[in-house]
């Protein structure tokens, strides 16, 4: 019996030793409750300059997520943003923005200092810009404005890969540093939003209340960025990467795409409707990337829209002008060399740094010197401007536009052509002649312009050509003839 007792006691002693020895000399980690994690997050966000968030414990919901992270939901938080607390480079007063949100969801890992914005429900932002703009304009010696307000509301928004971790360590950072941190964290992210409204109000010179309201049923955005290049514009001490190597890699520095559906715009004066418009669908993309040969950079945008309709009660001619079934527009600035882009980025970076120091005279001198470098590299690049509209389907007919000009030197206009193709010209002119909504003056003016400047071929198609030539600088040609 004694032997059995001592054996059991020995086993128990060894077991306790194995449990206790690894923890000797260590402090026991405090495990926080879910609600304490949420409260700590709110407290940390309140340390962001200008940001104030209040949320009652009963309105906080904490759920487990993947990778031992938390899903933290704040219901009906009270949020205020004071722009005057941000380092904008100008003195700002009365710049508080009130933000109401029904629900905001974060994904959070306090150990990794990670914070992601997941979704927002029922947002309302209200801002009286009068004080902000007046102060900003007065700093530039201009007269202030009155009665300027903006309201932004949104039914919901869902975010994918939107990392806002820089807010967890923003207490001592200025705006430019935060922008750089956000760019570094968000090389690629997506947003899907519904029921968005932008309401801009202001007083006209005659003290009439003007209201411009933009409603968007659905909107999606996608952004991809090569952060190493863009971050260097905002972060102090961060050098630009070798842009020649960036060209060889063939990766876009910035690629932004946005699409919207059921877009409505209305303009009112003293609550009386001046005009409105609708677009069934629109898509916009903005890019800055290497060309197909990886030899030069291209900067530009694309814009497509379907079914634009305007309603202007007191001007039927504007309604007709805005009756567009379909339009596709492209613009690009091409042949941009790596040295030119570097000189431009150097100027942007220097402007950011000098703006923060408020040494305006020194900034101006630096800009003048760097501007000469930019001009020199610009001409060495021999950049080309390209613009096109196709398709363009209007109430009266169709047309296509092609523009291609190249800068060869600073002392002469760019060389190239702008061509407008108009199929079935006579059919369009017949429709214009019979349009009762047009005034006699407008109708006769359009018919006269077409007859005078639109040559028509044997197939009934018209072509208008404007050009400049390298061998005749300073002379402009319309349809092959010099313009006198």
Regions found by a protein language model. Give the residues of each.
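Positively charged n-region of N-terminal signal peptides that target proteins for export
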Residues: 1-4
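Bacterial N-terminal signal peptides
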Residues: 10-19
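C-terminal motif of bacterial Sec signal peptides marking the signal peptidase cleavage site
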Residues: 21-23
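Glycine-rich, small/hydroxylated-residue low-complexity segments
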Residues: 25-484
């Amino acid at each position: 019996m004694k032997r059995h007792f001592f054996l059991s006691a020995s086993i128990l002693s060894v077991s306790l030793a194995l449990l206790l020895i690894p923890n000797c000399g260590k402090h026991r980690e405090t495990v926080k409750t879910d609600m304490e994690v949420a409260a700590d997050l709110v407290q940390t966000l309140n340390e962001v300059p200008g940001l104030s968030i209040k949320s009652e414990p009963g309105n906080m919901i904490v759920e487990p997520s993947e990778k031992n992270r938390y899903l933290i939901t704040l219901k009906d938080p009270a949020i205020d943003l004071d722009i005057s607390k941000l380092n904008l480079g100008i003195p700002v007063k009365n710049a508080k923005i009130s933000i109401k949100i029904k629900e905001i969801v974060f994904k959070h890992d306090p150990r990794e200092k990670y914070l992601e914005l997941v979704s927002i429900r029922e947002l309302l932002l209200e801002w009286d810009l009068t004080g902000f703009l007046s102060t900003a304009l007065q700093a530039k010696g201009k007269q202030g404005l009155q009665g300027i307000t903006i309201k932004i509301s949104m039914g919901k928004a869902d975010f994918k890969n939107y990392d806002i971790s820089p807010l967890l360590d923003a207490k001592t950072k200025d705006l430019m540093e935060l922008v750089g941190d956000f760019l570094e964290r968000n090389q690629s992210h997506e947003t899907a939003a519904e029921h968005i409204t932008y309401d801009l109000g202001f007083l006209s010179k005659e003290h009439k209340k003007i209201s411009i309201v933009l409603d968007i049923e659905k909107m999606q955005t996608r952004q991809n960025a090569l952060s190493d290049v863009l971050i260097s514009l905002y972060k102090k001490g961060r050098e630009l990467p070798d842009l020649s190597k960036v060209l060889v890699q063939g990766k876009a520095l910035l690629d932004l795409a946005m699409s919207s559906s059921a877009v409505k715009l209305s303009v009112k004066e003293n609550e009386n409707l001046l005009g409105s418009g609708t677009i069934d669908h629109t898509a916009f993309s903005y890019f800055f990337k290497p060309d197909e040969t990886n030899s030069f950079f291209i900067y530009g945008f694309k814009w497509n829209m379907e079914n634009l309709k305007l309603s202007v009660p007191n001007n039927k001619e504007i309604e007709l002008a805005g009756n567009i079934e379909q339009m596709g527009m492209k613009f690009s600035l091409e042949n941009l060399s790596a040295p030119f882009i570097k000189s431009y980025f150097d100027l942007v970076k220097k402007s950011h740094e000098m703006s923060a120091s408020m040494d305006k005279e020194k900034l101006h001198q630096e800009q003048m010197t760097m501007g000469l470098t930019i001009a020199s590299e610009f001409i060495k690049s021999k950049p080309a401007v390209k613009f096109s509209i196709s398709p363009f389907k209007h109430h009266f007919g169709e047309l296509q536009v092609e523009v291609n000009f190249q800068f060869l030197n600073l002392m002469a206009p760019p060389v190239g052509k702008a061509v407008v193709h108009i199929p079935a010209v006579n059919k369009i002119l017949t429709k214009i002649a019979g349009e009762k909504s047009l005034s006699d003056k407008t109708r006769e003016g359009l018919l006269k312009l077409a007859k005078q400047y639109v040559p028509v071929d044997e197939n009934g198609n018209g072509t208008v050509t404007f050009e400049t030539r390298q061998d005749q600088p300073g002379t402009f040609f319309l349809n092959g003839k010099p313009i006198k």
